[in-house]
């Protein structure tokens, strides 16, 4: 898994974690936020590494499914980009344009 994908999943987890089961949330947080390996998570939870892998895989698929439907992460990225652009060139016209784009 490349770093960009890892960061994206961590961001999706931040937004959508409340929609996951407690175990999926726990396993995903351990893996993506606490940087634990699958083996470490399996040992801590007295389950097989394969069970952790399957749960994480399903959890990640759910996160992407929620994002495809709700697009909260994309909206967050768009707002951030617009604010960075505004910071670089602040004018009343640019502010109005950005507000219009965000609405």
UniProtKB/Swiss-Prot annotation:
It comes from the Bacteria. InterPro entries: RNA_pol_sigma_r3/r4-like (IPR013324), UPF0122 (IPR007394), UPF0122_fam_protein (IPR054831), WH-like_DNA-bd_sf (IPR036388). It holds the Pfam family UPF0122. SUPFAM superfamilies: Sigma3 and sigma4 domains of RNA polymerase sigma factors. Coiled coil: none annotated. Might take part in the signal recognition particle (SRP) pathway. This is inferred from the conservation of its genetic proximity to ftsY/ffh. May be a regulatory protein. Belongs to the UPF0122 family. This is UPF0122 protein FN1394. It comes from Fusobacterium nucleatum subsp. nucleatum (strain ATCC 25586 / DSM 15643 / BCRC 10681 / CIP 101130 / JCM 8532 / KCTC 2640 / LMG 13131 / VPI 4355).
